[in-house]
């Protein structure tokens, strides 16, 4: 009597554990100040038509920082918004054989933010299991004619979609200077290993402490990933500029009563 076949193997899929965190940071000028401000606090700030809080003050959108300035002549800089950045999109693949180099010429920048990642990161075994993997990248600056490694990064985990992360480079060389991204991990030559790497963008950052005198502003930081890649819009419900009105005028009811005396 012949032997029966061996037990079949059910392929296992490890959970994706890499998640991009992309923060939208913006300062919106509301108008000439001083103004009274949002009608109902954070409920009067809407991202993609959704208020930041409900009527009881509980968060509807999480991971949000909002800073308000009314527009006085002397007002403090908005905390957490002490820098201004200009992003340059690249979207270029980085391979083992071809590091990617760019030249920075802006004379007044203080720091660089480099955004990079993987298109996907997963390794499939001969039995069909889909497991985490890793890839190593170097970020280098050219100093005195030599490439110097500023960041040595290993991305380790699993994702079936694009994953981006970023690092900040301080202590920059005199301008102009070259920056490059180097892939240390060998390129995949099979569909069983998906680990393509890309340099998404770089952002030139200037450290400033702007007070925006006589201008009412809102500084807003929000985790854009929770909106699934949608373009973000922000709306505000604001009580406007504070001005002098007749003594017999009720600005809430918008009515006059009695005799005007100043």
Task: State where each predicted segment sits.
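Polar, S/T/G-rich
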Residues: 1-262
């Amino acid at each position: 009597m012949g032997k029966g076949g061996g037990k079949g193997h059910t392929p296992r899929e490890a959970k994706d554990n890499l998640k991009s965190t992309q923060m939208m940071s913006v300062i919106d000028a509301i108008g000439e100040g001083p103004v009274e401000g949002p009608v109902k606090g954070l409920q009067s700030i809407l991202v993609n038509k959704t208020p930041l809080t409900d009527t009881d003050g509980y968060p509807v959108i999480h991971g949000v920082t909002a800073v308000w300035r009314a527009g006085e002549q002397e007002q403090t800089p908005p905390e957490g918004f002490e820098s201004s950045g200009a992003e340059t999109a690249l979207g270029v693949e980085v391979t083992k054989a071809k590091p990617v180099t760019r030249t920075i010429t802006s004379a007044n920048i203080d720091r660089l933010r480099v955004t990079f990642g993987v298109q996907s990161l997963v390794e499939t075994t001969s039995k069909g299991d889909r497991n985490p993997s890793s890839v190593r990248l170097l970020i280098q600056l050219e100093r005195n004619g030599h490439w110097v490694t500023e960041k040595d990064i290993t991305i380790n985990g699993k994702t079936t979609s694009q994953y981006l992360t970023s690092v900040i480079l301080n202590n920059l060389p005199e301008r102009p200077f070259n920056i490059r991204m180097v892939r240390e991990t060998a390129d995949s030559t099979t569909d069983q290993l998906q680990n393509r790497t890309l340099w998404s963008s770089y952002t030139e950052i200037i450290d400033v402490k702007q007070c925006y005198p006589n201008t009412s502003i809102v500084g807003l930081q929000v985790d854009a990933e929770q909106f699934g890649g949608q373009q973000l819009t922000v709306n505000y419900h604001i009580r406007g500029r504070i001005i002098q009105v007749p003594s017999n005028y009720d600005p809430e009811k918008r009515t006059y009563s009695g005799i005007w005396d100043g």
